[in-house]
Amino acid sequence: KKLFADFKAKYPTAELVTYDAVPHTAALDAAQEVFGQRALPVYDLSGMQLVVSFQADFLGDYNGSSLETSYAAARKPGPDMLRHIQIESNMSLTGANADSRIKLKPSAVNKVLVEVYNGLNGGSVSKEAAGIVKELQEKGSNAVVFADGSKAAHVLAHLINQKLASKAFTGKANFLKEFDAARYQEFLAWMNAGQVGVLIANNVNPIYSNSKGEDFKKLVAKVPVVVAVADKKNEMYKAAKAVIPVANWLESWGDMAPQTGVYTLMQPTIQKIYKSRQIEESLLVWMNGKNNAANNYYDYLKANATTLIGGTTFNKALYNGVVEGGSVIGSLSYTGGNAAQAATELNSFKASDLELVLYTKTSMGDGTQANNPWLQELPD
């Protein structure tokens, strides 16, 4: 992001649009409403005594972060061992590990979630929800609720945790997911209006992964210059006017700030095998011109990292891989959330004889690794 800011200083009309093939739009929109920030909350299940999950596969790809370690710590046998209630429509890894798994249609899951919220706030509830409400009240701050699906479900789960004063909520923010559907739609409007002169696609392929990929392909055709930074000959590669082979991540330098207080560096394990370059190297070349000493991305990375790692030396940070407690800031706190609107939306889902649940298979992801034979051996 620092590099793109420098790039934008050179080219003021440049815009950065983040695209996720598997978006967490509902979760991010809910976080924006409840916490006032578009970042996912970080939870810690260590020491918790009750977790109630509504469609949330929190041992899978839920919330953009992993809870397996703290879940395992809380599940050690003992008087305060974590009790796990899973309410879901399809079988998940998380549901398979639950003490009590309640199988319901999606519309029914929504209604139980609303009733649990109402019950915790003094409202009347059904017999099924009453038992969950009672357990949550007994455990209080040692309980936590997760939900997945719509924005409304996430909002109610956050507000339930606020009501419980759940200790699982750390106040830390997870920055790994950034896709903004509104921003993406704005970008599509720019292309449709002929306002995009150059499009640089950094190893993304919306033509394949987006539900309206064919429409995206037609819009791309309106852009005079399309550059695909790609690792394979995919649909975006075919639509581009120019292609830059991107370096494999095992050949690349980089840094990340995955969550509050954590800064991490990545370094290549091998020299580049082919004539390729990572997007950061390309941005430096486009900023400074060819054969410029300032195009060395390692030097750029080192200079920027030094400002983020506090008193740690760059070599020490590189050796450890992770620097905790650095200058990566951003904390979350409860600042809002419209429970009435969320409840109305969830109750509006009409029950029917057949209801559809769509989910992302963790092992397949967005399908970009479908040419890996191992991924063709999965039972489903």
Task: Report each predicted region and the residues it spans.
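Short hydrophobic/aromatic-enriched beta-strand-loop microsegments
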Residues: 13-16, 102-105, 166-170, 243-248
